[in-house]
């Protein structure tokens, strides 16, 4: 049986751990709110871009509108961009998305090549430790995450696509649903997939369909907007991943705090029982000694 001193040390240790997990939960909750604000701010812009591009494509009429980032070609070489976190203690956040990336690699072994790029230290460490060749690790992106930083990454991926190095670019990430729920998603970044028709784009957004007039011409507008649509799509995926990370960590730390509280209760009960047993034993020894002196 553990001594009272050992049990007290364990209680003190668990209490210290509970303080840490509680603080981490509060920090993650604050960061989650900020990440959610970013998602909400980007959503109307992204939806309107999709609507305009779909409108341009659907209302082209006799015009020959095209853009290389909208044109699909036979897929032989693919780049997979994996979004994980830099830190752990986030439940199944990283393991789920890494498992999905592994499945993507396994399901597409018929391709000529699959290049892997990573955002986040956890995914990079996992695949490097297993001998997987990583084309590029966009390290430190989360520390400076904004639209411009995401656009820099997107422009590098676009250059690879336009140069013919890859025929498609996919991103695998955690899509934010709620603070306690995230969905692993594989999304095609290039060639860009629009919502198809202007009616579909309008239905997906909050704005009603507008018959736009484009100046100076449709092709010029399309050339300007398509790269921006790629940028915002990657930026939204990064924001979704960040929000999912903080939601998963907040949930994990809440569970850890709850478990620590339960453990403290059990240890306190054990401590009291052990203390009672020690006192009872001492009383019995005193009584026995007194009886022996009679």
Swiss-Prot record:
Record keyword Membrane present: yes
Record's subcellular location: Cell inner membrane
MF-aspect GO terms: ATP binding; proton-transporting ATP synthase activity, rotational mechanism
UniProt KW keywords: ATP synthesis, Cell inner membrane, Cell membrane, CF(1), Hydrogen ion transport, Ion transport, Membrane, Transport
Topology versus the membrane: Peripheral membrane protein
Any one of the GO CC terms: plasma membrane
Keyword Metal-binding attributed: no
Domain of life: Bacteria
One record GO biological process: proton motive force-driven plasma membrane ATP synthesis
Main subcellular location: membrane
Short name of any one Pfam family annotated for the protein: ATP-synt
Subunit annotation: F-type ATPases have 2 components, CF(1) - the catalytic core - and CF(0) - the membrane proton channel. CF(1) has five subunits: alpha(3), beta(3), gamma(1), delta(1), epsilon(1). CF(0) has three main subunits: a, b and c.
Function: Produces ATP from ADP in the presence of a proton gradient across the membrane. The gamma chain is believed to be important in regulating ATPase activity and the flow of protons through the CF(0) complex.
Family label: Belongs to the ATPase gamma chain family.
NCBIfam families attached to this UniProt entry: ATPsyn_F1gamma (TIGR01146)
Annotated protein name in UniProt: ATP synthase gamma chain
Species for this entry: Myxococcus xanthus (strain DK1622)
């Amino acid at each position: 049986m553990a001594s009272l001193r050992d049990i007290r040390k364990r209680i003190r240790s668990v209490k210290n751990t509970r303080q840490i997990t509680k603080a981490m939960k509060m920090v993650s909750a604050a960061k989650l709110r900020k990440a959610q604000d970013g998602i909400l701010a980007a959503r109307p812009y992204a939806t309107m871009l999709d609507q305009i591009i779909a409108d341009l494509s659907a209302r082209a009429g006799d015009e020959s509108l095209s853009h290389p980032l909208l044109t699909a070609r036979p897929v032989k070489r693919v780049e997979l961009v994996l979004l994980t976190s830099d830190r752990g203690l986030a439940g199944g956040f990283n393991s789920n998305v890494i498992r999905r990336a592994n499945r993507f690699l396994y399901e597409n072994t018929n391709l000529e090549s699959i290049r892997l790029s990573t955002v986040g230290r956890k995914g990079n460490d996992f695949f490097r430790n297993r001998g997987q060749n990583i084309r590029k690790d966009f390290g430190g992106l989360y520390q400076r995450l904004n639209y411009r930083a995401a656009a820099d990454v997107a422009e590098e991926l676009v250059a690879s696509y336009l140069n013919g190095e890859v025929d498609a670019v996919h991103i695998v990430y955690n899509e934010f649903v709620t603070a306690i729920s995230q969905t692993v998603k594989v999304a095609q970044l290039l060639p860009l997939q629009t919502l198809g028709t202007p009616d579909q784009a309008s239905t997906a957004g909050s704005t009603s369909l507008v018959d736009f007039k484009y100046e100076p011409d449709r092709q010029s507008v399309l050339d300007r907007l398509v790269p921006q649509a790629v940028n915002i799509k990657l930026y939204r995926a990064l924001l979704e991943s960040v929000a999912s990370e903080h939601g998963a960590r907040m949930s994990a730390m809440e569970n850890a705090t709850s478990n620590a509280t339960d453990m403290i209760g059990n240890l306190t009960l054990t401590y009291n029982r052990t203390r009672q047993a020690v006192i009872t034993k001492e009383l019995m020894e005193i009584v026995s000694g007194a009886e022996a002196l009679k």
